[in-house]
Amino acid sequence: MKILKVKCLAPTRLDNYLTQQYPALTPGRLNKALRENKIKLNGKKQPLSTRVMAGDKIKLFILDDVLDADRRVEGPAWKNARTPAQVVYDCPQILIVNKPAGVAVDGPEDDTLLNRALLYLNKQGEYKENDLYTPALCHRLDTGTSGLVIIAKTPEAEELFLSAIKNREVQKTYLCVTFGRPMPPDATLGGYLLKDADRGIVKIVEDKQPGAKEVETRYETIAVSGRLALLKVQLITGRTHQIRAHMASIGCPILGDSKYGNNSANRELKLKYQALCAWELTMPRFTQPDFAFLSGKTFHAPKPWYYQQVLDGTLK
């Protein structure tokens, strides 16, 4: 464990202060460490956007070889991303990017979605490694899921969108293919989601239990092809693995899903990642003048490869 006593002349964001002290703590590493409760500010877990001041105490439960990794690697991790992010929308406040399946949104590796976004912004002349603010993820997608992710370009956008997403004000719609045709073809699923931390999965239960969170998922069948169904799914709540667990709970798991799916079918069809795409984002009405232009806008990712194949009947 490392204990840092903050020494700075002016209030500084927690993530920026830590990066100044340990350049190896990339945005991905910082986000991962925070999720794992490895960063404490004055004894408590705090958002990375929190301003630290002289006299504050930071505890880091991070291995020394991670903290000192900058001595072995030249430059920030985003410079080593394989390619700039595929941008769907760009404005002064946010980026909306299309995440490929198989790319992590963040983490210790170089080629993450966030690093691809930083590389894009650097090439546009909008971001440099010593900037006071580092663009940040506003929400996450599982590594195997493709689709739209919002990245804040300003502290104000980060605060606003984190709040809007937490309060379910941003409407998210997904496309997916299930192994099995759901009956009825259109429905709203309820229940409670319970995490199994030891196995890294979640399960849907009918009755409320300690630690379980209420979930609601709405689906609509677009087309069927043999054993498969193409669905449009709307998240009413937004929990870990919610769509994957909910569809599996009714006997129609997402095709390609190795955790909740039918692995023999996945092998037969040679699918590496789940056929799940965060396809559509619809913005709420914003009253803040700097964000009013985004009110009610809807954004779409390109339709995934399996969409047309189910419509054509070539994937079945």
Task: State where each predicted segment sits.
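RNA pseudouridine synthases
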Residues: 1-197, 224, 302-311
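Pseudouridine synthases involved in rRNA/tRNA modification
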Residues: 1-32, 64, 80-85, 201-203, ...
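Short histidine-centered loop motifs in beta-beta connectors
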Residues: 43, 226, 231-234
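Short, surface-exposed secondary-structure edge patches
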Residues: 47-51, 232, 273
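Short, well-ordered beta-strand micro-motif
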Residues: 59-61, 232, 282
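Short beta-strand micro-motifs in enzyme catalytic cores
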Residues: 95, 174, 229-231, 277-279
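Secondary-structure transition/turn motif
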Residues: 99-102, 207-209, 233-236
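Long C-terminal interaction/binding lobes of large macromolecular proteins
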Residues: 219
